[in-house]
Amino acid sequence: MTKVTPTSLADLIRRPIVTEKATLLLENNQYVFEVDPRATKPQIKAAIEELFEVKVTGISTSNMPIKKKRIGKFIGHKAQYKRATVTLAPEFTINLFPEV
């Protein structure tokens, strides 16, 4: 396992994923994040616990496939990314939607 410095922990977690399915998972205290494709589960756990000051009980990851994208006559593709579903201990929550 590679050594992770605190400055690189924030670079592992790219953004929270807010979809209908991810919103339903919030009821089970599960949060979905887009992470660096090279990140491992222990690195993701350390990053989430450090950034949000919570206790992680489980992580499942999946590599999302590359999808073709067509713009006019040109065919390109969307970048591949890794999705991590993080389960927190019952007493912890992450505030993804701060009050305005």
UniProtKB/Swiss-Prot annotation:
Q: Which Pfam families match?
A: Ribosomal_L23
HAMAP family assigned:
Ribosomal_uL23_B
What's an example of a GO molecular-function annotation for this chain? Answer: rRNA binding
Q: Which UniProt keywords apply?
A: Ribonucleoprotein, Ribosomal protein, RNA-binding, rRNA-binding
Please give the NCBIfam families that the UniProt record associates with this protein: PRK05738.2-4, PRK05738.3-4
One annotated GO biological process: translation
Q: Name one GO cellular component term.
A: ribonucleoprotein complex
Mind telling me what this protein is named?
A: Large ribosomal subunit protein uL23
Q: How does it assemble?
A: Part of the 50S ribosomal subunit. Contacts protein L29, and trigger factor when it is bound to the ribosome.
Q: Which family does it belong to?
A: Belongs to the universal ribosomal protein uL23 family.
Q: InterPro entries per the record?
A: Nucleotide-bd_a/b_plait_sf (IPR012677), Ribosomal_uL23-like (IPR013025), Ribosomal_uL23/eL15/eS24_sf (IPR012678), Ribosomal_uL23_CS (IPR001014)
Task: Quote the function comment for this protein.
Answer: One of the early assembly proteins it binds 23S rRNA. One of the proteins that surrounds the polypeptide exit tunnel on the outside of the ribosome. Forms the main docking site for trigger factor binding to the ribosome.
Q: Which organism is it from?
A: Acaryochloris marina (strain MBIC 11017)
Classification via Gene3D superfamilies: 3.30.70.330
